[in-house]
């Protein structure tokens, strides 16, 4: 893989509140009749009701279904079994709420760290006297440095703490080609630095909440949207 200039990166976040869907949104079949991706909006609000429907032809006979898993941060529907062509292979979301994202202006650097946690489960007489460890959970934290002084993330922090909301984050390393990390997160800290002979700066720290995705294209498919 060739080097990528850091200038190609970016940071995007959602803002509260989410927006209720005004009309049904179609979903694109990945080709296996199991994985479908929402056609227009990527990030959906997990605190709001979502209704998924199937149709035999995409225009009539829409019926609400519940035999699926929905991956909210990327708008992916995964059905328990493949849809049948001519019976129920057209899919749409008839009710739900989505997040609107925009660039965190002034952002100039981001740094993330993924960790896997383990638990020592070494028994007596362990082979070779080696410790035995069990993988438990994964976590991700990240920070963003900005040339900005405003309350955008501070407001989101207040909203999430009071109402139990969430923020959708995109950490791009190659925005032009759609390459980024995408996930829900909660802000954990905000610091500001004002120096007379420098520019105003703001640093933001956040913690991922739920699955983290690597996305390698703006065209979503089972090969370009990867859950870590």
Where are these predicted regions, by residue range?
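Extended beta-strand solenoid/passenger and fiber regions
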Residues: 1-67, 72-87, 96-103
């Amino acid at each position: 893989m060739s080097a990528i200039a850091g200038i190609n990166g970016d940071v995007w976040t959602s803002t509260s509140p989410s927006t209720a869907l005004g009309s049904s949104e179609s979903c694109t079949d990945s080709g296996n009749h199991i994985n479908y991706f929402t056609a227009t909006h990527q990030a959906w609000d997990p605190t709001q009701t979502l209704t998924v429907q199937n149709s035999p032809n995409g225009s009539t006979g829409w019926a609400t279904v519940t035999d699926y898993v929905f991956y909210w941060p990327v708008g992916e529907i995964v059905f328990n079994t493949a849809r049948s062509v001519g019976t129920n292979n057209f899919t749409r979301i008839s009710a739900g709420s989505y997040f609107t994202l925009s660039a965190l202006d002034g952002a100039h650097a981001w740094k993330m760290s993924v960790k896997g946690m383990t638990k020592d489960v070494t028994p007596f007489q362990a082979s070779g006297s080696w410790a035995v460890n069990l993988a438990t959970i994964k976590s991700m934290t990240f920070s963003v440095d900005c040339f900005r002084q405003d309350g955008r993330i501070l407001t989101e922090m207040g909203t999430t703490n009071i109402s139990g909301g969430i923020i959708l984050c995109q950490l791009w390393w190659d925005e032009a080609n759609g390459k980024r990390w995408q996930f829900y997160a909660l802000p954990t800290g905000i610091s500001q630095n004002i120096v007379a002979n420098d520019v105003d700066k703001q640093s933001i720290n956040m913690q991922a909440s739920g699955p983290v995705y690597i996305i390698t294209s703006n065209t979503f498919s089972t090969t370009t949207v990867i859950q870590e």
